[in-house]
Regions:
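Conserved loop-alpha-helix segment in the C-terminal half of the alpha/beta-hydrolase fold
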Residues: 274-303
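Short glycine-enriched nucleophile-adjacent loop
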Residues: 113-124, 130
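Short, surface-exposed "cap/lid" segments of acyl-processing enzymes
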Residues: 15-62
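Catalytic active-site module of serine/aspartate enzymes centered on a nucleophile-bearing elbow/loop
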Residues: 258-259, 297-334
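Alpha/beta-hydrolase fold nucleophile elbow
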Residues: 99-110
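Alpha/beta-hydrolase active-site loop
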Residues: 74-98
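Alpha/beta-hydrolase
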Residues: 146-278
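N-terminal cap/lid segment of alpha/beta-hydrolase-fold proteins
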Residues: 1-17
């Protein structure tokens, strides 16, 4: 094992016995540490206060330092989705044994939703239900995807890690988040905005589709809250998992992997939340992944005007995501 081949688990619980155990799988570049400690902005704390014990995972990426060199980042070359699913299985076994529930619920946000589906494919006897927070597993009308050339391109580039800093750079990203956290009403670095909070709101509003990443300009979330969430991201993520995702999404049963072998024959209950801000194809694929999974117990929630991050930290998330999730889990707790 290399220096970064380790995972972590954060346990969130109230005093007294729990009614259920939930394993939470973060999105790309996210981790299991509580960046936000108010219950209305943190699903883990909301559930824990209501008797649902939560174990939030740190992927191996949490161990990789932000200033890792290209040579050090070669460690991410073999961090495939299958490797992460094996890590998730180890975390699930620990959570089951520690929490005292033979079956656990698994929640995943974004890429974590993809990994939640994959884990449930490999360990259906251990999963009481899936909480899918704005993420697809399969695509309704994906074209054929040839994995080999994509892997060859990765090999040729030598870029085994994607950088959440993007074109603006990690340091500039972090400085913007820190400035908004310190005082969202402070003057903006860009004079076209009246405050640094407004500047971040516009950056997030236009990062993907308009309102796709978040919809603060539409009043669905607050820049200062989003900044606190984003500041604690991990910088690096294995690029090979983008290839894995396209491989699995492109067919009902990808021959290159066993991570989707049970899709279409699922018997696991599924609770889905999908944000409209991510676009029509995103919603269609998220719904398709749940409805055609094979499960006879699928609950769908399409969140109008929500951006991706608003599902976690939006002003209405506690009422429209957290509360229904708690009720759904309690109704299905073994």
């Amino acid at each position: 094992a290399g220096p970064y081949d380790r995972i972590g688990l954060h346990r969130y619980r109230a005093s007294g016995p729990s009614v259920a155990t939930l394993l939470y799988l973060p999105g790309t570049n996210m981790n299991g540490a509580a960046a936000l400690t108010e219950e209305k902005y943190n699903l883990w704390l909301y559930l824990a206060a209501r008797g649902i014990e939560v174990y939030a995972l740190d992927y191996r990426t949490h161990s990789v330092p932000p200033d890792a060199s290209p040579d050090q980042l070669k460690a991410l070359k073999d961090w495939t989705s299958a490797v992460f699913v094996a890590d998730i299985a180890a975390a699930a076994d620990f959570a089951r044994q520690t929490g005292g529930h033979d079956k656990l619920f698994v929640a995943g946000f974004s890429r974590g939703a993809f990994l939640a589906y994959a884990f449930a494919n490999t360990a259906p006897d251990r999963v009481a239900g899936l909480v899918v927070l704005d993420g697809p597993f399969k695509a309704l009308s994906a074209g054929a995807f040839d994995r080999a050339p994509s892997l060859a391109d990765l090999e040729a580039s030598g870029t085994w890690a994607s950088d959440v800093g993007g074109s603006k750079g990690w340091e500039a990203r972090q400085a913007l988040m820190q400035a908004v956290i310190a005082d969202p009403d402070a003057p903006a670095a860009d004079p076209q905005f009246k405050s640094i909070g407004d500047q971040l709101a516009h950056v997030l509003q236009t990062a993907w589709l308009p309102g796709g990443l978040a919809n603060p300009e539409g009043g669905m979330s607050r820049p200062a809250v989003l900044a606190r969430l984003l500041k604690d991201y991990d910088r690096w993520y294995p690029a090979v998992q983008d290839v894995d995702g396209k491989t699995i999404a492109s067919s009902a049963n990808a021959p290159e992997t066993d991570l989707d072998d049970l899709w279409g024959k699922f018997q696991t209950p599924i609770l889905l939340f999908a944000s409209t801000g991510m676009g029509g194809d995103w919603v269609i694929n998220a719904v398709h992944s749940a409805v055609h999974s094979g499960s006879g117990d699928v609950t769908l929630n399409v969140l109008e005007r929500y951006g991706h991050l608003d599902v976690l930290v939006g002003e209405q998330a506690a009422a429209e995501v957290f509360e229904p999730t708690a009720a759904w889990i309690k109704a299905r707790a073994p």
